[in-house]
Amino acid sequence: MSISEMAFQVKEASIRLAAAGTELKNKALENIARLLMERKDEIIKANNEDLQRSREEKLAEPLLKRLKFDEAKIVDVIDGINSLIKLEDPVGKTLLSTELDEGLELYRVTCPIGVVGIIFESRPDALVQISTLCLKSGNGVLLKGGSEARETNKILAQIITEATEEVGIPPNWIKLLETRADVNEMLKMDKYIDLIIPRGSNEFVRYIMDNSRIPVMGHADGICHCYIDEDADIDMAIRIVVDSKTQYVAVCNATETLLVHKNIAPKVLPELKRALDSKNVELVGCSETQKIIPVAPATEEDWRTEYLDYKLSVKVVGDLEEAIEHINTYGSGHTDSIITNSKEKAAAFMSLVDSGNVFWNCSTRFSDGFRYGFGAEVGISTSKIHARGPVGLDGLLIYKYKLIGNGHIVEDYAKRTKSFKHNKMNKQFPL
């Protein structure tokens, strides 16, 4: 079957899926969770095959970490599905209701985007997270995973397909593409695919953005910052920075650059270095940092680099304004955190840093759809159009206007025999 035929099938199925009821969708999600646990041994076996082959092919260590899909990760995705089941169905919610005139009522109502094309590297958990979010939000999904995860992706897509068809979800709502050549053809399928969401490396995402006819939602970089202000609590700062950098390094919300106010740097940097040394983190720093702790020099490129590894660049800054300027110059608009006891400085930081997620006194690792209570996420968007930050169910919806009349025609209003009232109503769409 050609990719255009597969995309057409998903498009057709998405129209029927958009009308599926909440009970049916939740029943399908429950069945997916059940089958994932029942067939976990098959999944782990397939993943071990992918890991072994990828090690032989010298896949980079950060990608190997993302590729691993063991029992703990299976439990995590099942937890995400269970959280998703508990969330309110976002489809069919009335956002606005207006009485245009007597008997003529306008409603703005949420609906699925249609067909979402997901192109992702390494992470099999992304396949489960994204497909279940698409299911709950009523969207069809066309998946293209990396060749390094082909066996894991294949079994996961098979399980999800079987689980949903068993309970009566329209068949063909989900399809997995399996050859590298499919990507470029997929990016031209604007007739069938409504949105592309890429998950992967900087180069990978930029390639998708540069070569797609279809709107792309996502982020190319995860260059996240922590800024330790002069009014910070040192113990708190160390805990937050260590967590932001080392809790899991191979993810887009891990901190890559640390900014430290010059007045607190002599106190906090030596203690912080000891804490990060114990986690085997390599530090590079500016000339002022090197005067305080023994580290290799940071280059201009370091400020622009997403390491996804045990490495952190450190810069001493003169004040809050310099920290904000650095973040807005070198950051990727993903997640940035200030550590301070000053409410005023925190407010300024959170207003002036141009990122989708801005934090005060907490780890950058919190920028995640599951942690935000979204059930899971299809990814992080640094775009300023449609969705920003962790994209959960709401980010997979658009809306349509539904107008109910009783023989109303525009000619009456053009001739001024009738006039518009435009009265706001607090009313749900009745159908």
UniProtKB/Swiss-Prot annotation:
It comes from Acetivibrio thermocellus (strain ATCC 27405 / DSM 1237 / JCM 9322 / NBRC 103400 / NCIMB 10682 / NRRL B-4536 / VPI 7372) (Clostridium thermocellum). Belongs to the gamma-glutamyl phosphate reductase family. One of its GO terms (cellular component) is cytoplasm. Its main location: cytoplasm. Catalyzes the NADPH-dependent reduction of L-glutamate 5-phosphate into L-glutamate 5-semialdehyde and phosphate. The product spontaneously undergoes cyclization to form 1-pyrroline-5-carboxylate. It is an enzyme of class 1 (oxidoreductase). Transmembrane segments: none annotated. This is Gamma-glutamyl phosphate reductase. It is found in: Cytoplasm. Pathway: Amino-acid biosynthesis; L-proline biosynthesis; L-glutamate 5-semialdehyde from L-glutamate: step 2/2. It catalyses: L-glutamate 5-semialdehyde + phosphate + NADP(+) = L-glutamyl 5-phosphate + NADPH + H(+). Its EC number is 1.2.1.41. Keywords: Amino-acid biosynthesis, Cytoplasm, NADP, Oxidoreductase, Proline biosynthesis. GO terms for molecular function: glutamate-5-semialdehyde dehydrogenase activity; NADP binding. It holds the Pfam family Aldedh. GO terms for biological process: L-proline biosynthetic process. The gene is proA. PANTHER family: DELTA-1-PYRROLINE-5-CARBOXYLATE SYNTHASE, GLUTAMATE SEMIALDEHYDE DEHYDROGENASE.
